[in-house]
Amino acid sequence: MKYPNLLERFLTYVKVNTRSDETSTTTPSTQSQVDFAKNVLIPEMKRVGLENVYYLPNGFAIGTLPANDPSFTRKIGFISHMDTADFNAENIQPQVIENYDGGVIPLGQSGFNLDPADFASLHKYKGQTLITTDGTTLLGADDKSGIAEIMTAIEYLSAHPEIKHGEIRVGFGPDEEIGIGADKFDAEDFDVDFAYTVDGGPLGELQYETFSAAGAELTFQGRNVHPGTAKDQMVNALQLAIDFHSQLPETDRPEKTEGYQGFYHLMNLSGTVEEAHASYIVRDFETEAFENRKAAMKVIAEKMNQELGSERVSLTLKDQYYNMKQVIEKDMTPIHIAKAVMENLDIQPIIEPIRGGTDGSKISFMGIPTPNLFAGGENMHGRFEYVSLETMERAVDTIIGIVSYQD
């Protein structure tokens, strides 16, 4: 095996519970991420050859592999996140399936199976080594596969000084899954020409377009009276919430959109006759379409208040991140390099928009163009998550190829 420590490194990482917590007020949101960075990652960063390794109060573990050839003038960064998504991450027991036969994979004793009839992506991996869950937790390949791949690439470069490269900066950060990990990222400290998040899915993914994103919070104020005498007096806040939602386009929902189509997504609805609350996320790719979606919500709220004769609908909109294409398309160098490297490795680049966001969405707007590379995970964020060891190895190949690339 070209990278003999990759599998064991990955298994070590995923067994540590680093689930983030969106209700927390601390950074990182969970102490487990701090402990993972300080007790697991930082010692290993030093072991694999990174220098000037340190932990920042923003939750990022940072390190540098110095250039070994002055003709490589670009400084390149690689970033992955430590936290895992909002699914059980306690006592993760990964299964290693060698030489996958293409059939059904029982997930431990859970009664759940990875079945190609349900997950057609499995057909691509016959004969490969797969790492799965035992059916009771997620796996955490999102994004501990990325961390393991970056760490392994650095280890390989340190052991092979004949591979010439420029300065490499590495950052492992918190809370990507709850959308705040990059909020406090120190771009000035990281100091690279461009970077890559290693946080994508299947082999070949290369992404530089994300949604632009906003959150919408609505409060509906009702008036509760006895239902027996409610005529022309009661205002049902729950009905107001329903009325608001019904005025959004029925086709513009996550379950009915794909590709470059945006949406409104009702995330939470709660309340009583007296008061109700609704939370939405708003997503689109183009700036004009994104702004139009937010404006449409304002128009609906204003119209309802006008019809009701009082301010019973309150809307608060907050932008979360923007499509990093706006930054990256100004200089496509990181895309051209990654694409050329993949093609040299006989990897077919898959350049498609991310129907979501990455840490790179925010970091790009901090002045460091940061597209996203594949890390290998499939079915992420749940019990059916799995990753191919061979795809992880190819990700390591790609990282090494990028840093050693000369125009």
From Swiss-Prot:
Under the heading Pfam families, the entry gives: M20_dimer (PF07687), Peptidase_M20 (PF01546)
Locations listed in the record: Cytoplasm
Assigned keywords, A-Z: Aminopeptidase, Cytoplasm, Hydrolase, Metal-binding, Metalloprotease, Protease, Zinc
Which GO terms of type biological process are on file?
Answer: peptide catabolic process; proteolysis
Reaction(s) this enzyme catalyzes, per UniProt: Release of the N-terminal residue from a tripeptide
User: Which annotated residues bind Zn(2+) 1?
Assistant: H81, D142, D199
Tell me the domain of life.
Bacteria
Q: So where's the catalytic machinery, residue-wise?
A: D83, E176 (proton acceptor)
Q: How is the cofactor bound?
A: Binds 2 Zn(2+) ions per subunit.
Cofactor names from the entry are:
Zn(2+)
Q: Kindly list the positions annotated as binding Zn(2+) 2.
A: D142, E177, H381
InterPro entries for the chain: ArgE/DapE_CS (IPR001261), Bact_exopeptidase_dim_dom (IPR036264), Peptidase_M20 (IPR002933), Peptidase_M20_dimer (IPR011650), Peptidase_M20B (IPR010161)
Q: Which GO terms describe its molecular function?
A: metallopeptidase activity; tripeptide aminopeptidase activity; zinc ion binding
Q: What is its EC number?
A: 3.4.11.4
Entry GO CC? cytosol
Check the record and name the PANTHER family matching this protein.
Answer: PEPTIDASE T
Q: Fetch the NCBIfam families from UniProt.
A: peptidase-T, PRK05469.1, PRK13381.1
| The protein's role, per its UniProt record | Cleaves the N-terminal amino acid of tripeptides.
Q: What family is it from?
A: Belongs to the peptidase M20B family.
- The protein here is known as Peptidase T
Give the organism, scientific name: Streptococcus sanguinis (strain SK36)
State the taxonomy lineage: Bacteria, Bacillati, Bacillota, Bacilli, Lactobacillales
> Gene symbol?
pepT
